[in-house]
Amino acid sequence: MSSTQEKPEELDRIQKRVNKILEARLESDKDTLDALSGLSTFFTENTLQNRRNLRSQIEHRSVGINENFLKAFRQVKLSLDAVCEDLDTMATSVETMKSDLETSKALTKDLIKQTNTMQRERDRLEVHKQIAQAFLARFQLSGAEHQLLYGAAKDAPIVADFFRVLDRVQSIHADCRLLMQCGYQTAAIDIMEEMTLHQEGALERLYRWTQNHCRSLENNEIGPLIVEAMSRLQDRPVLFKYVIDEYAIARRAVLVRQFIEALTEGGPGGNPKPIELHAHDPKRYIGDMFAWLHQSIPTEKENLSLLFKKCDKQDISDQLQNALGYIADGVCHPLKVRVETILQAEKDTIVLFTISNLLRFYQQIMRQVVQGGSLEECLVELQKSSEQIYLGALAAQVRSVLQRPSGGSGLALEPPQRDLVPPPSVARLLNMLKEILSVATMVDGRQADITKIVSCVIDPLLQSVQESAAHLPTVDMGVYLLNCLHHMQSSLAVYEYMDERVERLQAQSDAQLDTLTSEQASSLVANLNLGPIYAILQSNQSKIETNLLKIFMSKMDAFLELPDVLLLPQVQLIMSSSHRAAVQKRSFNVIVAIYKQIYERVHDPANGFEQPEQLLHRTPEQVAHILTST
């Protein structure tokens, strides 16, 4: 029964295995595939015997493989044993070394402690070193800076970095105040003293270099270094003044040499030509000399201004003017000698007056550029001298025109001619005066010049005219003087600043007009038989003889027909129509006034004149109208 039951179970197990095998996906089972692949290497023929021996073969092969593993692991074990021995040896060595280290550590403990202490000290000293280096870098000059400040050699030139180092010296000196505030007075004072010495030495070197540079200036090559140097030297007024003096001395010599070269040699290559080539033309010669100075001296002033461009710590305008004055003073002697030579040699009054105006013009121009000094004094002296010379020449020329023909002493004109016109000498002197006054000038002092010139000519001319007319009859003298005065007045009236002189001449003319009017009126009174009648009027007598009135009225009617007939012949010789008309009008007014008195006396019923209309048939208004309309 049990066997019967076991068979189905056995079959089931077999069936399950078969099913399991059948259901297995051998293509995805790598281990099974590898096993089958290995089996194919020794199970080559599928026979019953081979299948029965398969198990034993597999076990045999398994034993062989295990033996190979065992042999291999034996070699590994031997190697591991050797490694273990080495490790044991190393452990022993390590223990030995550890023991030695412990021993050494115990022995060097103090050394290590000392080393650590020294290491900390070194770190502290390193910090101090860095602080000291920073302090020195801030408050001391480096070797390169020291060399820049004092120069590699005695005559080493100044370079731009010199001023940078000098600024650093001044900055260090200023920063020492911070040190003093922080309590480092001793160090600060020492550094300040050292920087002061550096600064003094640097400024002394800068002074020598600047002085030498100024001595060698030829073409005013003022560069930025010399400008900066002057700015730094301003802190030392004495050195600053010495440099300015040296510059002025050098430039004075250069200016004088260039002036002499311009006079004698001209420009480069002869262009422009030497100024002295025009010495025969005084106006151009003197004008060219002053034009050259007018160009050169302002250039010197511009260069001085450039030299002092950065000198803004104090007012140096006086020093600039003094230096410029000293430079310009060098040309005084050669200029004065040449101008005085021209003034002494020239005789033409107009040329002398032109030169005087040139001198005054350039004197005013130069005063705007350079004030004070010998040049200004020289120009003032030359201008005054030229004024005296041309006024003297003018006076001599006037005297030569007015000289007596007989050569006697004193001045006199030609005797007046019958026509009583001004003599030729008057016209000649007035034309000469006109030529002088026509010289164009816009300088200050023109009014004084014109006044002096006019006085130099007109005063002796007036005196001579009056002397020459002294022997003439009254009427002739009046006409002659009036004509001469009119000629002078009309000549001067066209010029400026002549108002006062013209007024004085007009006053003299008015005096002569009064004289001529009086003479003309007296002549009319005599010709019209007004003398007896006028005497009666003046005596306040009421009765006038009728016969006198008839004679007067007869002549009066003839006079009213032709008023000019009774005019003095000399009045017709008056050159000015206005003067002539004035004499005529004033004298006629006298007659009209007398006629009016007579008319009123005759027509007054109290005087008992019969038929006054027949005696005086014209009213005073009619008489005045007739005489004023002629």
From Swiss-Prot:
GO CC terms, sorted: Golgi membrane; Golgi transport complex
GO terms (BP aspect): intra-Golgi vesicle-mediated transport; protein transport
The keyword Phosphoprotein is assigned to this record: no
InterPro entries noted in UniProt: COG6, COG6_C, COG6_N
Highest taxon of the lineage: Eukaryota
UniProt keyword annotations, A-Z: Golgi apparatus, Membrane, Protein transport, Transport
Pfam families assigned: COG6_C, COG6_N
Protein name in the entry: Conserved oligomeric Golgi complex subunit 6
Lineage: Eukaryota, Metazoa, Ecdysozoa, Arthropoda, Hexapoda
Gene that this sequence comes from: Cog6
